[in-house]
Amino acid sequence: MSQLMYEYRDFVASRMKPMGTPREDLLHMTLGVAVEAGELVDAIKKHWVYGKPLDVGNVVEELGDLLFYIQGVLNIVTSQGVLAPKTLEDLTVANMNKLSKRYPTGYSDQAAIARADKD
């Protein structure tokens, strides 16, 4: 795995606000995901609904903030001894594996309905 991803994991850990308990930390970081996702949606909405130029800088900033909070959730989950991806790179590999089962040759509506990755 990439050294950068391990550095980012530790970077996020050093910048997360401790809330008291792992449960409270998890809620804080999960709410951060929701808030940043909402800010990303707002940036896209302004472009799509109101016809404003897409603020690419803002979109990139919100995506970065999402990465921070997602890594924070990973940090908390893995600190609980749960077998889970430890870095965003691990998460990316797990997601690619899941979606490769669902869409072996690429996206199709038929494959989406069949959901080969679900029993």
For each feature predicted by the language model, list its residue ranges.
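Flexible "arm" and connector segments at domain edges
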Residues: 1-119
